[in-house]
Amino acid sequence: MKKTILLVLALAGVSLSAAQPLAQQQFDIPKPTPKWFGERIALPPKGFAPDLGLKGIEEILFAPGMFKADQPDFFTYVFLFAVEAKPELTAKVLQKELFTYYAGLSKARLGNPKLDTSEFAVTVKPMKPFELKPKEALESKSFTATVKWIEPFATRKMQTLHFELQTWKYAKSPHQYLFVCASPQPRDKDIWKTLRKIRGGVALKPVK
């Protein structure tokens, strides 16, 4: 009985959190090791993609070798978008917004607002539901994607990133959520086990 009561209270706390304004929502995104590091930014990101059509917040968690081109976990990371109800996060919308995000990031980091992005490309494909999903996620949808862009931090060369994307909602919430696992390594490599485990541990912190 006690466990049941605690579970009900926890679910109620999550529902209250999900109903809060996006800027007030907080998330648990588990770190595989203490060396993983992250940040939180507002969407759209005014510094590099002000034209992004999604409004809310982004939580990012980077692998230790994120910005070190000689490391096996180079440019490997996860991020979470908590955004308004519109536009709906369909494959078409995700493709458009990912292009805006990464093209803007390249231009800003390279200091070239007129950067030629004609060779940039984003593909998004719906998939069967992934086995692991964030806790309390409802109406989840799964996608894979690739992003071809100029990696602007370390190599400044063309790079192909592989993605797993999952969208979902929470009970009694008007908002949408997106979790992305990203790496230049193909999805059958060991690093993806780590990324998927992170996704399975994501949770909206309940209101206390």
Roles of regions detected by a PLM:
Residues 4-14:
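Sec-dependent N-terminal signal peptides
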Residues 14-20:
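C-terminal segment of classical bacterial N-terminal signal peptides
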Residues 21-62:
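N-terminal "mature-domain start" segment
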Residues 30, 83-93, 181-188:
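Second-shell loop/turn segments in exported
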Residues 44, 94-101, 191-194, 198:
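Stable alpha-helical elements in mature extracytoplasmic
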Residues 67-153:
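Conserved polar/disulfide-associated segments of primarily extracytoplasmic proteins
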Residues 135-208:
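Short, well-structured beta-strand
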